[in-house]
């Protein structure tokens, strides 16, 4: 499974020239640090690492997500992916990104993800998200 994750990561590097890079932290009983590429304002792939663990137990998770509802201050997404090591198997995330500030690069997220494998778990998480580069949706112009 790790070989497949590496292949997908290198394939995503090819589209990174037209993608927006971001980072996220998912706080839960199974926390994750994520690195993502957002492509064409509708798709994003996220590679997640499970911190707070020994290296031999480090869990890798890769998800491909589609943004179903894309508004100025929030978006709703869902996807599918896989997870290695701890709770190995299929991952089905669904969540909301909220961008409440004028700077739409920084925001918060809430996510529920089904982890399906030998043991099935429903993981709920919340956290922060930051997108590098230009804003995806410009802030509304204020009349003076």
Predicted regions and their residues:
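Cleavable N-terminal export/targeting peptides
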Residues: 1-20, 134-144
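Short, hydrophobic/aromatic-rich segments at coil-to-beta transitions
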Residues: 19-22, 41-46, 75-77, 109
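Solvent-exposed loop/turn segments connecting transmembrane beta-strands
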Residues: 20-35, 48-60, 72, 82-91, ...
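A membrane-pore/channel beta-structure motif
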Residues: 20-22, 30-32, 96-98, 106-112, ...
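Residue-level signature of outer-membrane beta-barrel architecture
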Residues: 37-39, 64-68, 84, 96-100, ...
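Outer-membrane beta-barrel "beta-signal"
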Residues: 64, 120-144
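Short loop/turn motifs that connect adjacent beta-strands in outer-membrane beta-barrel proteins
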Residues: 69-76, 101-106, 135-144
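Outer-membrane beta-barrel porins/channels
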Residues: 92, 112-114, 140-144
